[in-house]
């Protein structure tokens, strides 16, 4: 993965970790047609957690991991669900453990969850796998000041078929991320880190606007995360 962004499209920076050349035709989202009313949120790594604080102390089930959903990335999913619902979106937030008790096979289990959810919500295009970024430096806390508050930065991770698995939707997924990030740049410059484009598909073949969103990293705290408005 490149250390810095390799592409800039209308102010949206992208780290291209694939062999694809990102042309304007690939990145242009003007023709993107998706159902914008319904949103699905789930967590492949449900137990991912943040740096504990006095106000947010929790029992770890592993390093920066907890099965207590009040202190894991699921809490961030709850906040995002509340925000999107207040804006009029229909949101399904699944809180199934996919990485506990076994971490290996998480993506296979979360794929089964999403496939089952799509049976009852077949028209959902926006499918968000909400994560906490895993960085070797556990003190790393990507953040930015918005107004008087310090908040955690966000990052889209978009998969492709570069790893050899079928993934006809990856360009649509990327266009969706570019569209959202361009708008976010106008409202909250710097809230998003560069989009990360990878060879793995991360179950994103299941939607026309499917993505991973990394919310902060291990060094961030829930105090910072609670201030995010998307």
Predicted features and spans:
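Active-site-proximal helix/loop segments of hydrolytic enzymes
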Residues: 107-122, 126, 132-221
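Conserved small/polar residues in nucleotide/adenosyl-binding loops
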Residues: 229-230
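N-terminal catalytic or cofactor-binding beta/alpha core of small enzyme domains
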Residues: 1-123, 135-139
